[in-house]
């Protein structure tokens, strides 16, 4: 039996998504000993909410440990334009001295396969294992502004296997503080940007079946992960990460695997949950955008850019509006 340490972060707004995530973890990891660590800022969850997640976890055969982060524990970390809440996972090395590695999962995730192989990834002296992000393809100009080594492929921090033992060998708060001060105006994702800076040349890249953005063009996907790997990931995903501002619990979501989230929800105490934005207008809008999104995804990024130069500005803006951009 594989012992797997998993950290998640939540607040009162993420109780339902976190429960869906946990349900999916336990459904596909019955042969593994799972310990869930719940990261949350003091005051962001009620005692009843924390107890509810604990009961759910233990009822599925897992172990549970709450990790309440008090303001003084973040005192050594810098203020960012996004606040300190985005830096919670960086507290893990100091808070869990007895744990050498931990898998961190964002709340907008559904697990579809065992996590044992991912957790068994040989990190060596690397700080982290993570999946590649498309940012270097879409926004290559951001990398030097963020101080990211050009030989390092920027990763997405929604699914990361963290080498806590290696992280404890460096002064993480001090490094993050210096980084934030030097790149304050350009940081968009505080923990993700900082981790990419710190972990340059000490990152193990995961197969895209563990973390892949579905809403990208074919040429972007091929450049980021490789065409064969993308096909394999779509055919048999281990982790579905709903990257982007519109999540599957919104009726406006057009993600091709949004049904996986709702199916998993029905096997939780929140079965029958209705999206907060479930209105007739939003349903009609989504029904119109889904086929348009499918058509859009058939284009390559280079093809879109060429087409964009040919189309009148008003038509381009209308198409973007229809696609919800």
Model-flagged regions — what are they?
Residues 1-27:
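N-proximal low-complexity "stem/linker" segments adjacent to membrane-targeting elements
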Residues 1-4, 10, 169-325:
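A glycosyltransferase accessory/donor-loop signature
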Residues 4, 29-37, 64:
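Short loop->beta transition adjacent to catalytic acidic/histidine clusters or analogous donor-positioning motifs
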Residues 34-42, 130-131:
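Short internal beta-strands
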Residues 49-50, 55-95:
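Active-site-proximal specificity loops/subdomain of glycosyltransferases
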Residues 66, 70-71, 85-138, 156-168:
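GT-A fold catalytic core of metal-dependent nucleotide-sugar glycosyltransferases
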Residues 76-86, 143-147, 220-225:
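Short, surface-exposed amphipathic charged segments that create phosphate/polyanion-binding patches used
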Residues 128-148, 254-255:
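A short, conserved beta-to-alpha structural element at the edge of catalytic cores
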């Amino acid at each position: 039996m594989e012992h797997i340490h998993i950290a998640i972060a939540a607040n009162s707004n993420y109780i339902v998504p976190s429960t869906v995530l946990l349900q999916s973890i336990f459904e596909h990891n019955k042969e593994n000993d799972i310990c869930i660590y719940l990261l949350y800022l003091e005051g962001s969850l009620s005692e009843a909410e924390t107890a509810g997640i604990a009961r759910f976890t233990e009822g599925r055969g897992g172990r549970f440990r709450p990790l309440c982060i008090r303001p003084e524990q973040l005192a050594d970390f810098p203020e960012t334009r996004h606040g300190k809440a985005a830096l919670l996972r960086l507290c893990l090395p100091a808070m869990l001295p007895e744990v050498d590695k931990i898998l961190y999962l964002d709340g907008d995730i559904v697990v579809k396969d065992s996590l044992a192989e991912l957790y068994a990834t040989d990190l060596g002296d690397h700080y982290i294992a993570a999946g590649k992000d498309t940012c270097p393809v879409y926004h290559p100009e951001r990398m030097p502004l963020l101080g990211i080594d050009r030989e390092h492929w920027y990763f997405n921090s929604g699914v990361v296997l963290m080498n806590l033992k290696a992280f404890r060998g460096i002064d993480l708060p001090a490094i993050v503080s210096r980084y934030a001060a030097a790149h304050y105006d350009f940081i968009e994702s505080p923990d993700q940007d900082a981790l990419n800076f710190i972990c340059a040349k000490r990152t193990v890249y995961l197969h895209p079946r563990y973390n892949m953005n579905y809403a990208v063009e074919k040429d972007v996907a091929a450049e980021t992960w490789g065409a064969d790997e993308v096909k394999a990931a779509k055919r048999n995903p281990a982790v579905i990460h709903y990257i982007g501002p519109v999540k599957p619990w919104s009726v406006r979501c057009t993600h091709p695997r949004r049904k996986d989230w709702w199916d998993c929800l029905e096997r939780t105490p929140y079965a029958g949950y209705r999206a907060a934005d479930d209105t007739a207008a939003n349903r009609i809008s989504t029904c119109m955008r889904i086929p348009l999104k499918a058509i859009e995804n058939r284009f390559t990024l280079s093809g879109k850019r060429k087409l964009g130069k040919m189309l009148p500005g008003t038509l381009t803006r209308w198409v973007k509006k229809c696609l919800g951009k």
